[in-house]
Regions:
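Glycine-rich phosphate-binding loop and adjoining beta1-alpha1-beta2 segment
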Residues: 2-33
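A structured beta-alpha segment of the ubiquitous adenosine-cofactor-binding alpha/beta core
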Residues: 24-78
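Hydrophobic/aromatic beta-strand patches that form the interior of the parallel beta-sheet core
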Residues: 6-8, 34, 58, 84-86, ...
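Short, well-ordered alpha-helix to beta-strand connector turns
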Residues: 2, 30-31, 54, 101, ...
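Residue-level detector of anion-binding/catalytic polar loops
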Residues: 4-5, 56-57, 241-243
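Flexible, small-/acidic-enriched active-site or ligand-binding loops
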Residues: 257-278
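N-terminal Rossmann-like NAD(P) cofactor-binding subdomain of oxidoreductases
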Residues: 40, 59-113
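Acidic, glycine-rich segments within the central catalytic cores of soluble metabolic enzymes
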Residues: 12-13, 24, 94-240, 244-248, ...
Length: 278
């Protein structure tokens, strides 16, 4: 979007840079990173100087914390009347100051399967997309003469929204997208698994015809998929315009660089963090 973005970090930096430097670098590519201690009056004055020429402020702090720093929306709007503000919070009012993270938001809406941790940070990523929409909406409204505005984006609400197919039964166990329909599911192959998504009738009928399935559809598919590897089935499906993909891992290596669909082992790796190797 060709926006000029300045990211304000605390003096110690963003913890993500320590946890996962590669991900941090990818997320912040093209941004100017400035470290400020906003409890320090001089650093706070530096922020105010930047806000004089800023179109949009995006925050991810609890409103009470922003208020203590003099960054509540009423204070900001009075001082910087052209500034729009998108505030990412954990929960909608009246609980916007309650603590939480992606894991606790997902826990509230049924998308966790203990003891496994979620592989996708649904609330964080969906919340980020909502924040972009909110930012564009506020800026467009300002350009149309409606003045600068403020909008909260609650991550828990993003988690709730993404859990709706589960809550409505569509993706629940036994639902059409939860194992109830044999044309939509995961199948074991001679090596690895495939994901089949033949939801539309023409895909489903073509699949059955190509494979010669006429009896117990699920049982026949389970038997047939065992005859080839996942990679072979994917190639077979591509030739027939069928929605089927091999299940992949997420590991990357030099050979796979540039090919995010590289086939990798599905075996779980045991974490060695904190392991004594002496």
């Amino acid at each position: 979007m060709e926006a000029s973005v300045v990211k304000i970090e605390p003096p110690g930096g963003d913890p993500l840079a320590r946890f996962n430097s590669d991900y941090y670098e990818g997320l912040n590519a093209g941004q100017e990173v400035v470290r400020l201690g906003l409890k320090d009056p001089k650093d706070r004055a530096s922020l105010h100087s930047r806000l004089e020429e800023t179109d949009l402020l995006l925050t991810a702090s609890r409103p009470a914390a922003l208020g203590r720093l003099g960054l509540s929306w009423p204070e900001l709007h009075a001082r910087f009347p052209r500034l729009c503000h998108v505030a990412i919070v954990g929960h909608p009012p009246p609980d916007e100051d309650a603590p939480g993270h992606d894991l606790t938001y997902q826990a509230r809406f049924g998308t966790l399967t203990p003891p496994e941790l979620p592989r996708v940070l649904v609330a964080d990523l969906a919340g980020a997309e909502r924040a972009v929409s909110a930012a564009l909406s506020l800026l467009l409204a300002r350009e149309r003469g409606q003045g600068a505005g403020y909008e909260q984006v609650a991550l828990s609400e993003a988690a709730r929204s993404f859990a709706e197919p589960l809550r409505q039964g569509l993706a629940a166990p036994g639902g059409d997208l939860g194992g109830g329909f044999p044309g939509y599911g995961l199948y074991h192959t001679r090596e690895g698994h495939v994901a089949l998504a033949a939801l539309e009738l023409h895909f489903w009928e073509r699949l059955l015809q190509e494979l010669g399935v006429k009896g117990d559809e699920r049982r026949d598919l389970e038997r047939i998929f065992e005859t080839k590897t996942a990679k072979q089935w994917e190639e077979w499906a591509a030739e027939r315009d069928l929605p089927l993909a091999a299940v992949r891992g997420i590991e990357r290596n030099e050979e796979a660089e540039g090919d995010e669909t590289a086939f990798v082992s599905e075996r779980r790796r045991t974490s060695t963090r904190g392991e004594d190797k002496s």
